[in-house]
Design a protein with these regions (language model features):
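Catalytic glycan-binding domains that act on GlcNAc-containing polysaccharides
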Residues: 20-204
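Short turn/helix-capping motifs enriched in Asx and small/polar residues
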Residues: 1-21
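Polar low-complexity intrinsically disordered regions
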Residues: 13, 205-206
Length: 206
């Protein structure tokens, strides 16, 4: 069951909490320039970045998340468009993929590194860069064993499992999340490179 969100008949929310596929697609289209730029920056296929974000939105995000993300800085919660955990962002920083966040004092109140990271992750553009950086981390970690840069199902699985993932091997298996990423991959490529012109919808797929 869906209802309009913010009196907008296009933006709908599921009363049971799930983000609609339409809303998730719109999120990708709204941020496609940032997704493509992050892919170039971290040498990750932008369509895989988009597919991970899309599947997170459809499977793991509900309307309560947007209310709770910024209230949970003291916990290792998943935040933002790509549902990046605070600990994951710190891992990415500590491995040199992103500049390290620093805690600081503000009016004698200490703002922890975790709080700084959580605030950063609430910004879509920054969050997308962390998604891309984390996927780059997994590509590099596996590079000596298997090139997974063109395997959306496996990168999606690793993105989802994190520390619970198997060690690099030559016969990786995808989980449910990874298979959803694989299914979404082609659609994300079309969304990212769709261009509307005088000749109608065209695609500029690199």
């Amino acid at each position: 069951m869906f209802v309009y969100c913010l009196n907008n008949p296009i933006c709908r929310i599921d009363l049971y909490g799930n983000v609609s596929e339409e809303a998730a697609k719109e999120k990708i289209e709204e941020n496609k320039e940032e997704i493509i730029a992050a892919g170039k920056e971290f040498n990750v296929d932008p369509a895989i970045i988009a597919a991970c974000i899309y599947v997170e939105q459809v499977l793991n995000v509900n309307w309560m998340d947007s209310l709770s993300d910024l209230l949970c800085y003291s916990f290792d919660t998943s935040i933002g468009i790509g549902q990046v955990r605070v600990s994951t962002a710190i891992l990415v920083e500590d491995n040199g993929y992103m500049e390290q966040s620093q805690g600081f004092y503000a009016n004698q109140l200490y703002i922890s590194r975790e709080e700084v990271v959580a605030t950063t992750l609430a910004d879509d553009k920054a969050n997308i860069r962390y998604v891309a950086a984390y996927l780059a981390y997994w590509q590099d970690r596996w590079s000596d064993t298997l090139d997974i840069s063109n395997m959306p199902e496996i990168l999606g699985t690793l993105y989802n499992l994190g520390d619970n993932a198997n060690e690099p091997n030559t016969s990786p298996k995808s989980n449910g999340f990874g298979r959803h990423v694989g299914v979404a991959y082609g659609m994300m490529k079309m969304l990212l490179y769709k261009r509307v012109g005088n000749r109608g919808v065209q695609y500029e797929i690199n």
